[in-house]
Amino acid sequence: MNDQLAGLTGEWALWRDCAVRSAGFPVRGLDVFGSDESAGLRAVAGDPAFREAVTWQNREALHNAVDKVAAGSPTGASTRRRREEVVANYWQRYCAKNETIGFFGPLAWGRLADSGPAVAYRAGRVDAQRSVHFEQWAIEALAQSLGLPDPIPLGPHPERDLRIRLQRSPHSDDGLAALDLLESRRSAVAEATRDKLDAALAHLDRTFVELTRQEPWRKPGEAYGARTPVYLDCLRDLQLSVGPGMRDEMAGALPALLASSRWYCDRIFDIGRTLMRDAIGERMASGPTIGRILGELMRIPAQVHAVTAQLQTKWAQLLHANEPQTLVERASQVFASGGPGWPLSVYHSPDVQIAAASALAIEGGDFLSVVGDFHPGANPLCQGMFATRHPDREQFVTAIHTEVGRPIVFLIPPRNVPRMTSRVMPAFTEPTDIHVAATPGACMPDGFPTIDVGRLLIDGEDVVEPTQGIRFPLIELLSSPLFMAAIRTWDPFPTGGHAPRITVGRTVLRRETWNVVASNAPQHPQDLPGWARALGMPRRVFAKSPLEDKPVYIDFTSPILMRTTGRMLRHAAAATPQRPVRFTEMLPTPDQCWLRDDDGDAFTSELRLVCVDLTRRAGTTS
């Protein structure tokens, strides 16, 4: 065990560093829903911090809805309701959801300690450190307008890569002047006060249009996904220490989930290896192409769904067993797996929310640790939004290479992957790693040698780059589609229509959920509260439609949220009539949010933990 790992069990350890994600507005903001909502939402629409948040995300919504609600502009009932729904949708997100964007989803870092209370912290401003960045597409648009067709590498500072290219080009004075101008507009945005931000962004947009002859937005109407030329990142002023008491509590349940994740990833690895060997075995005169094998794996193989069913069956057996062994002991037997897996499957990552009224309540044992999103066979802190803002980036990168091994084979993501931005692009490799471009436009920053996949030859189950003498296992190149298949299909617990909460000790492995076929749900807002009560749903839940990537917060006492929920159900019933909408209890509840700022306001929060499989670390034999 090194200094960067905290022990969990003999097979599992935790990174001492964890990401702390939170909402940017106090959870008490949800009190606006349920009574006299119009007055409450009018106050929200006039709040300077809320207005700034919407300005960063959607200035059209600011002008067409937020401004009108704040002013109480006279209008028909239908238009007023529609505008209030816009305000409500942003407000529920800012108060109830843990994110990593802007000051409405600030990032912080916590530390797992070997002594001290279960949780100790000091919190200040949500936006203690601000930085404004260009979106990748905006800088690429400028590059194209300057006659530089080659793509810009995905990264947190694409303007720097563009500047390097311009400085290498003859007659680049005009290009450098254009970049200087756009950067000056970005600086003005970063320095703008709340009341001047809208104008500063508008000025940047006009300059962008003048320089590129392109519109200053993309994906209009979406709430997520690199829509505007620049974005804001914030670090929260937070010093957080998680003591051994919390870790000891999680050790009674979390390793069972980790064992099942390892088993699941190994089964997916087996599927990928079989597909690879079949493709190699079918070689014709020209031999199989790596691109063809990648194409097979990019589509989630049908066999994965059978493995998911096996995973749920095994968990059902675990949860209904009456043996005297602990859950962790039973899971180690039920999910026994000897590997191997892809290199990064040494990692598994749960998001853990602590449900408690205060840090004092946690120390007194009055808490639940709630497992939320789970990332099998992956380390989400490798994404740029985390990796580039780690307080000790050198130590961060060294830890990954120590645990995974060197060199890491990295398949550069295709540029056309939905939502592939610099914030989600992995940012943990070194120039000495092996970077492979599988598609046109896939590239790395200067100093990171890149190999075109067309230069690679298959030799048995290895890949060879003959001119440089590079050789590595083909399956390592295929690990990216394998772990994406694991993440997209991970669903360990059998659900059915209603699935009760699963609690082991003080650890909640699954919140209570209700899966409702959209076509069977009420379509009218006034019918939804009674329907929910009859099913046993609490007042506050999150709902995930098969048509959406993200869940939304719902309060069944809110007329406005009932209208938006009814619309969601109608759309789902029309588009996917037999697929369920999943409702999940809100846990922690608003009175179980322990993280407070220096004003005493409580915020929703979660710890993004990284678990290390000690049996799979580089240099370890299982």
Language model segments and positions:
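Type-3 copper protein
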Residues: 1-404, 588-589, 594-621
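C-terminal structured domains
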Residues: 354-621
